[in-house]
């Protein structure tokens, strides 16, 4: 294959094409979207984690010039909008009615002529709260005498879920020479994207049409839900996700602010915009982690792992409002067996409602993978110290070997490939591990506190195969639509949505790799449901494995038609034609060729008899399998015993994308 033809493709470093507009301040975010007669919305939030709402008095707010409407839960309830579905199959209060269930919950909204008036009016709304005891500990929430977080539920259990074989695991533990136990809490954290949530809605009730700008990682899924809530045909609802200033899982859920903005536009018959403030974002939008984990590792006398047992308490706050595949209530936590050949395992998970903001989003990972890797790596390291083994050696003894692939884990995953020992050995070599250990011992004799940590992890990404993965019944495929115009340039439309990942560069590069077209000649569209094929969006480490694969597949679909056009131009049979990126040529005479640009022109000006003109196709890609990235990290950290100050002495990371 000609080197020049490959240069636009995968493996070559290209400047990110989208960065220029951001550096110049020319990005288009929801806050940049406006329209004539646009009104502005602000949200009143509860200062209490749990309270009964005795009354809401908005009389004083209406005395402020410019206030258009005050929306409460009771007003929405009269329009059948008190509750909205979540992407995990639960329901969530749009605005609190009768009771607030977490600090920061949306209680009322003011819509005014300008944002300053809207925020000032919030201070004039009088809410009479009766404070109630709040449940913030999931263990307490499961006690028989605990008050209900949700009146629509019979208890505070969100779900019960398990994976693996409990009986076989019990037998493995009964035969173990040693059992290592760990209880740990992975605390709640907030993704805190640079841009908070935002929504612009322009609803025309007479035309039955809605145009909505949204900070969404999954525009098509949000369109499906919002169309149902509004009672509009889905094709009449347009969701546009323009430039998004980061998300990290935080912009996958559907939020009450979005729904109320749309409802306000419907009520007022004019455009309404809501820009969330940082306080509201940190108080109420999707948190991550919040797992209480109990892990047990059974080992024989030589340090071979015999079994793994895990119990989880997952705190989801007042509403199960994140986005988990419906079959996997605890996400993909059952990747917890990691890189190790563990014969049997059993994981049981309990999701719990508490008086906290909704939690459980996949922050910087794929569906709970970070928590899983944290637990198994802590367990293996603890076991090594208990057995007086080097942590690297215990890992080597228990890795899945290359010849064992494809490998089925004890919790049901089918790993396709990996060489975990090679990754660890490379990380140890690059870190100078043996020398680090010597320096550690010498330092201890001089009173230095130096720790050396190792992590050898396996992730799971690319959700997912439709037979197993969906959100609210929507299968987790993704899509790409590609058209080659007569000049040989390309227009690519995607079902995934960028929030800063660089899709406009990455996906253009995939087209360049497949077709030999310069990435500069590929226009990439995404984030507009009227101008892109239906897809599940970008979250959970899936955009390139699914959307990227859809892009590669649609390129190859086009090549099938392009080959017939090339054969017609060269006046030979299809079988006489060969392809390399950028050109078709005769197998018997490689200098006789037609370029992809010449083929594109012919598709519109001189197609073969009986062939439909044009050169375009769409691919809905259903992944046959997940992907299993893996790696090994080595870090050395020193702590000052007098001040507690710490510093990283060395950090080496070895990653394989799977």
Report residues per predicted region.
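Glycine-rich loop/linker segments at domain edges
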Residues: 12, 18-21, 86, 155-199, ...
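Helix-loop-helix junctions that connect adjacent transmembrane helices in secondary transporters/permeases
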Residues: 143-230, 401-489
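Flexible hinge/switch segments at interdomain interfaces of large molecular machines
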Residues: 30-38, 192-197, 347-358, 482-486, ...
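Internal maturation/activation junctions in enzymes
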Residues: 574, 583, 587-628
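Alpha-helical support elements that line or immediately flank enzyme active sites
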Residues: 43-73, 109-129, 199-268, 325-337, ...
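Flexible, low-hydrophobicity surface segments
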Residues: 1-155, 182, 257, 464
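Structured beta-strand/loop patches that form or line metal/cofactor-binding pockets in enzymes
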Residues: 272-295, 466-469, 618-641
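Short, surface-exposed loop/turn segments at secondary-structure boundaries that line and modulate
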Residues: 71-105, 139-151, 217, 221, ...
């Amino acid at each position: 294959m000609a080197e020049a033809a490959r240069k636009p493709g995968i493996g070559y470093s290209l400047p990110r094409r989208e960065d220029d507009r951001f550096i110049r301040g020319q990005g288009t975010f929801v806050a940049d979207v406006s329209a004539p007669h646009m009104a502005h919305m602000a949200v009143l939030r509860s200062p209490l984690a749990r309270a009964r709402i005795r009354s809401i008095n908005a009389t004083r707010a209406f005395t402020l010039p410019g206030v258009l409407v005050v929306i409460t839960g009771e007003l929405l309830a009269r329009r059948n909008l008190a509750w909205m579905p979540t992407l995990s199959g639960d329901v969530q209060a749009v605005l609190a009615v009768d009771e607030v269930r977490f600090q920061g919950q949306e209680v009322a909204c003011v819509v005014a002529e300008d944002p300053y008036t809207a925020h000032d009016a919030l201070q004039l709304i009088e809410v009479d709260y009766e404070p109630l005891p709040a449940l913030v500990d999931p263990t307490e929430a499961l006690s028989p005498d605990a008050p209900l977080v949700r009146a629509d539920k019979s208890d505070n259990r969100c779900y019960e879920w398990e994976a693996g074989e409990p009986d076989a695991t019990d037998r493995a533990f009964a035969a173990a020479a040693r059992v290592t136990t760990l209880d740990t809490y992975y605390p709640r954290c907030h993704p805190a994207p640079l841009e908070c949530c935002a929504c612009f809605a322009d609803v025309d009730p007479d035309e039955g049409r809605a145009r909505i700008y949204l900070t969404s990682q999954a525009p098509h899924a949000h369109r499906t839900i919002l169309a149902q809530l509004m009672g509009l045909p889905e094709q009449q609802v347009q969701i546009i996700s323009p430039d998004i200033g980061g998300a990290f899982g935080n912009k996958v859920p559907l939020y009450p602010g979005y729904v109320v903005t749309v409802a306000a536009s419907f009520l007022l018959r004019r455009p309404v915009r809501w820009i969330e403030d940082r306080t509201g974002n940190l108080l109420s939008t999707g948190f991550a982690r919040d797992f209480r984990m109990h892990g047990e590792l059974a080992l024989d006398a030589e340090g071979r792992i015999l079994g793994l047992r895990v119990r989880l308490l997952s705190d989801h706050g007042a509403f199960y409002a994140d986005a988990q595949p419906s079959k996997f209530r605890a996400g993909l936590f059952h990747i917890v067996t990691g890189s190790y050949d563990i014969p049997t395992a059993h994981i049981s998970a309990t999701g719990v409602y508490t008086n906290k903001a909704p939690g459980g989003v996949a922050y910087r990972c794929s569906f709970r993978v970070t928590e899983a890797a944290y637990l198994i790596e802590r367990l293996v390291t603890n076991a090594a110290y208990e057995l007086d083994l080097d942590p690297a050696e215990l890992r080597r003894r228990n890795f899945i070997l290359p010849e064992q692939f494809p490998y089925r884990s004890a919790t049901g995953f089918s790993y396709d490939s990996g060489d975990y020992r090679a990754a660890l050995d490379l990380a140890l070599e690059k870190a100078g591990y043996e020398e680090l250990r010597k320096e550690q011992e010498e330092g201890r004799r001089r009173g230095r506190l130096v720790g050396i940590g190792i992590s050898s992890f396996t992730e799971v990404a690319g959700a997912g195969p439709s037979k197993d993965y969906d959100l609210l019944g929507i299968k987790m495929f993704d899509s790409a639509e590609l058209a080659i115009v007569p000049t040989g340039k390309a227009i690519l439309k995607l079902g995934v949505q960028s929030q800063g990942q660089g899709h406009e560069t990455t996906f253009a590069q995939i087209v360049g790799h497949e077709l030999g077209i310069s990435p500069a000649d590929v226009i990439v569209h995404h984030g507009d449901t009227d101008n892109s094929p239906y897809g599940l969006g970008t979250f959970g480490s899936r955009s390139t494995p699914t959307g990227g694969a859809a892009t590669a597949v649609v390129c190859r679909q086009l090549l099938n038609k392009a080959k017939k056009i090339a054969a017609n131009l060269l006046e030979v049979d299809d079988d006489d034609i060969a392809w390399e990126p950028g050109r078709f040529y005769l197998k018997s005479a490689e200098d006789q060729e037609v370029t992809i640009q010449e083929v594109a022109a012919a598709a519109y000006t001189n197609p073969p008899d009986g062939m439909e003109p044009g050169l375009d196709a769409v691919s809905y890609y259903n992944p046959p399998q997940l992907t299993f990235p893996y790696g090994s990290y080595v870090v050395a950290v020193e702590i000052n015993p007098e001040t507690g100050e710490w510093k990283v002495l060395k950090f080496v990371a070895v990653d394989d994308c799977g």
